[in-house]
Amino acid sequence: MDLDPHAGVQVGMRVVRGMDWKWGQQDGGEGGVGTVVELGRHGSPSTPDRTVVVQWDQGTRTNYRAGYQGAHDLLLYDNAQIGIRHPNIICDCCKKHGLRGMRWKCRVCFDYDLCTQCYMHNKHDLTHAFERYETSHSRPVTLSPRQGLPRIPLRGIFQGAKVVRGPDWEWGSQDGGEGKTGRVVDIRGWDVETGRSVASVTWADGTTNVYRVGHKGKVDLRCVGEAAGGFYYKEHLPKLGKPAELQRRVSADGQPFQRGDKVKCLLDTDVLRDMQEGHGGWNPRMAEFIGQMGTVHRITDRGDVRVQFNHETRWTFHPGALTKHNSFWVGDVVRVIGDLDTVKRLQAGHGEWTDDMAPALGRVGKVVKVFGDGNLRVAVGGQRWTFSPSCLVAYRPEEDANLDVAERARENKSAASVSVAGSLSVALDKLRTQKSDPEHPGRLVVEAALGNVARALDLLRRHPEQASYHPALVVDTKNQGRTALQVAAYLGQVELVRLLLQARASMDLPDDEGNTVLHYTAMGNQPEATRVLLSAGCAVDARNGTRSTALHVAVQRGFLEVVKILCERGCDVNLPDAHADTPLHSAISAGAGASSIVEVLTEVPGIDVTATNSQGFTLLHHASLKGHVLAVRKILARARQLVDAKKEDGFTALHLAALNNHREVAQVLIREGRCDVNVRNRKLQSPLHLAVQQAHLGLVPLLVDAGCSVNTEDEEGDTALHVALQRHQLLPLVADRAGGDPGPLQLLSRLQASGLPGCTELTVGAAVACFLALEGADVSYANHRGRSPLDLATEGRVLKALQGCAQRFRERQAGGGGGVPPGPRHVLSTPNTVTNLHVSGTAGPEAAECLVCSELALLILFSPCQHRTVCEECARRMKKCIRCQVVISKKLRPDGSEVVNAIQVPGPPRQLVEELQSRYRQMEERITCPICIDSHIRLVFQCGHGACAPCGAALNACPICRQPIRDRIQIFV
């Protein structure tokens, strides 16, 4: 059973009490609504795995079971708040397009859908059975008819509710001050990102603004006067923590589709036409492709299949109209699947398995022979292996687009550059040895190639003012495909260039490759000739046959002075070439040797750092792909908001740095860019997944230390721990990972410091797995195939080491309390917090590491939250717990005695300093851009909010109040 990763528990979901509820009136009574604000995780001192923390609309905050001990205390009422949407579905009652939240489809009527609100308000025939879709990807769940079922009134923060500021309030005095009330006038979505996730509130002073009620898991409001929000059928809502199964798209022969699969449509035209109704539609031209081989390009949100037949033709098909074609032939490029256990199982009777084949897992190879039994001989990494066809998938080049493999883009451009340079060198040699009549029309080009300025001048003087049209001497006549001006410019013969310009030689005439004279000065690295041509009015942005400008050429060849001159003369630094690469893309591809050029280009005022090339890489993506640290810093300085921007496949800059082992780039993105280390791509992989997948041992500790979750799962339910044991279980740790990479040594030192015996003998996969287990990775976490890391650790020594590391983590989390793993524990975040699930008894506290000073000491117990995080010395000055932010009412030593707060230094001087510091911070906050948090506000919008000039120029709506920006006023502070 495959589970839909989008249907799992996420912060922001709106919930009501469920079938296993036993917590009295904590929710304010049956029908009360709350918001999931925190998820449990294995080993957490706050909440264990399969529990959640809920902030109820009426104010109480506590934890509940979402699969823990097999119980489900809550039901999911609405998931529009986490961005769930059915893009191509229209509610047939309220007619809203792009249905948000759960979808309810009638099983009796053809193509009839309702949104949650309409379904719960008894729209459509109550005797009809419906299907529930939690997401656009999940399998439908069949429901009984609504007729006769009890409906429960919904109460909470809805239109008309009376509210005050809530637990996540961070909006100053917008409400008029603590305790002031407001009235909810509307529940809406946050732009196009989420639905029904914010409330529009009008306060007592008449001001209106929007506040979070589920958006990003935050709740800015607390309900003091509930409003009715409709009804719900308790029996028809899904249990929170029980994700829906993934909807499988299958072909006509019952096999599930994947991107890159080879398919054919083998149906008659009439049958296909009927099937296409509601599945992409019918076009008569589709009949031309019946029986032709195509490639699955993508699966649409509705489950239809987008098939590409050639470079330009794509059609959308009903999945049942297609048949998969699984054959491979000699010459086909394939990829070996990466799951070690799966390959071992499939190889039985098909060439068998040997441990020497391990390096081929996940690699790309070519089919060199097809055996009679269907097995294939595949060349991978210089060796040949026999594989079962089930172990291979068709290679999709776009999969490697995020890998800096063999510097593909740079090699292609360098090869083209070398080709042009070589042909030009051959042409010059031919010109210099050419014996021609002195009156030959191309003689002027020969003299330019020989550098005979005097002879060229003599030829020009012989026909004054007629050189441009004299039959015996045409100044723009080509010889070997070049004009005299192009040759002179390439060789840097400035005097001859001036003479030819005086003779009205054309500056715009291209050669056979489309290069103008300015391209030739760039190819020849001739700064002075470039100046002369630009002063004479030469087109600075002329493009050749590959759509490259002279700036592209100069950048690709690394000619800094020419680049400077072109930029000074106002060339367009944003023009893309045939690959949609800008000059800065090319400079980044050139590596560290072009750092000075990167400096020059990024200082040009009009440069567009958001430019994207044909592979979907922005400049920040490209710099992260290539490991260009300087470029990353320069781009972040101009547009830090791009740090988490995603490509079409969901890859961010940090994904690319992690995938390609660019540790320093990752450090810059984390520390200077403040990127989201837990961001996930379309396959739900985090940067940690990719670093582990590629065995980049230096990046794994960096990402974990930066806060990357070790228990995040990808689309297959695999955590980083699963990946480590699947991909690199057989690779030796040091022998194969040496060569100047400090990563293995860093990771080894961390393992040795933990006291793990024999860690130097571990393989790469085992070492990474042990490190992750030490950092809290759940060794019992089951993926969608039901396999845990302990199941994948087939070797007894590795299994024992993994269990030992997990035990060390539990002991560390318990504060050295004898290694008893902590039970469910609640995060007490507000005065209204109640704890449902209590910690099992543990041994008395022993010396542990203080989270502030890192000294080993007896930790102080905070009340009411019951956290032990810091030593006595650090605890004296604390007002709030640093783990849960609850105000501390009492601080207790292990013996039960109370810690007295630090003595305040009396006297006006200290109070004055604190007051001035507070005022300074307030002033700084008022004038700092709320987007980049780096620059001062320079632009003010009509709503009163503002931003710095670079951020403000790119905005269409105010980031604070979401009002459209009609005017920008520049200020000086």
UniProtKB/Swiss-Prot annotation:
Residues forming the MIB/HERC2 domain are: 1-80, 149-227
| GO terms classed as biological process | Notch signaling pathway; protein ubiquitination
| Catalytic activity, as annotated | S-ubiquitinyl-[E2 ubiquitin-conjugating enzyme]-L-cysteine + [acceptor protein]-L-lysine = [E2 ubiquitin-conjugating enzyme]-L-cysteine + N(6)-ubiquitinyl-[acceptor protein]-L-lysine
Gene Ontology MF term list: actin binding; ubiquitin protein ligase activity; ubiquitin-protein transferase activity; zinc ion binding
Q: Which UniProt keywords apply?
A: Actin-binding, ANK repeat, Cytoplasm, Endosome, Metal-binding, Notch signaling pathway, Phosphoprotein, Repeat, Transferase, Ubl conjugation, Ubl conjugation pathway, Zinc, Zinc-finger
Cite the annotated pathway: Protein modification; protein ubiquitination
Note the effect listed for C951S. Answer: Abolishes ubiquitin ligase activity
Residue windows of the ANK repeats: 480-509, 513-542, 546-575, 579-611, 615-644, 649-679, 683-712, 716-744, 785-814
Report the function annotation for this chain.
E3 ubiquitin-protein ligase that mediates ubiquitination of Delta receptors, which act as ligands of Notch proteins. Positively regulates the Delta-mediated Notch signaling by ubiquitinating the intracellular domain of Delta, leading to endocytosis of Delta receptors.
Q: Give the protein's recorded name.
A: E3 ubiquitin-protein ligase MIB2
Recorded source organism is Mus musculus
